[in-house]
Amino acid sequence: MDNNLTVADNKTISVVSNHELGELIQPLIREIHLFDTYVAGTTHLDDPSVLKTITVGEELVLRREDNPFDRKAILVLNSAKQKLGYVPERDNIVFSRLMDAGKILKVKIKGIKEQDSFTRIEISIYLVDL
């Protein structure tokens, strides 16, 4: 399963605004804040140096993953498509359903806290309402 429905660098919005109806549609586009959570699994990365490249306010990418351990798994990737971790399993059921239904989700880094060998990435998840 490779559903990758996100807004990265406002590409979706720019496609709409370049359309002849873009000026009418653009004011209707809004981001609805859904939830704050964190990125799970940051201690299990193959390349933990990727955690040094992220910044507060950065937009991340969500991608559904075909995962035998969690049927609702959602990968969290940086803009270069490098794995940062997952939306926590306890939080992913609604977001996976939205993504599977074709909804566009946007993620922003809200905070980064380094604790010993653990990096906690706090994120905000938004629904892009077109």
Give the predicted meaning of each segment.
Residues M1-L130:
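Conserved active-site motif detector
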